[in-house]
Amino acid sequence: MSGSSSLPVVSQESHLVEILCALSDHHVDFVVAGGVAMVLHGVERTTLDLDVAVSLEPDNARRFLEAMTNLRLAPRAPVPAEIILDQESITALVREKNALVFTFWSAQEPYRQIDLFLTRENSFDDLVADAYLLPIRGRVIRVASRGKLIEMKSRVRPVRAKDISDIRALTELEKKERDNEGRTRD
C-alpha cells in the first residue's frame, strides 16, 4: 500500500473511533454492526459510516442524543432527533416510510455518519446477547457476533454483491477459527 492511499484510512479510523469513544463516554448501551463490525472481525473492506443497534430505553436514548449533539451530528432526514425517544414514532417510520435506520451525520463532513437501526430484527436486544467485547482506547465496546452479522446480511433485500462477499468472508473466518481450534485440541 502506498503512503498516499493509506491517508483516508487514518481519517476514516479517527472519525469512527471518535464516535465510538463518545458513545462509550456517554454510557450509551450499543452494539456495533455493519461494515465496521466486519472490519473488527478481520474482514478487509472499506466503510465510512457506523451502523449501531442502540438500546432505546428512554435514559439510554437520551444519552445517545447527547452524544450526537456533542459530536455535532444531526438527523439527515428533516425530522427532530427526539423522534427516537418515542417508540410509536419509530414504529411509524418503519411501517410508513420503510425506514431501516435513522441517520445522524455532519453536513460539513458527510463521511461522519452513524446509522441507528430501527427494526426489531436488528435491535440492541437481538444483537447484545452474543456480542463480543472489544477494547478501544481504554474503553470496551460491544461488536455484533459473526453469526448475527451473517443473519443480518442474509436478510438484506435486494441482495447486494457486497453482502454476499461479506457472508463468504465471515464464513471463511469461522471455518479457519474452527480448524485452528481443532488443531489445538489434537
Tell where the protein language model's regions lie, with residue ranges.
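Compositionally biased terminal segments of proteins
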Residues: 1-186
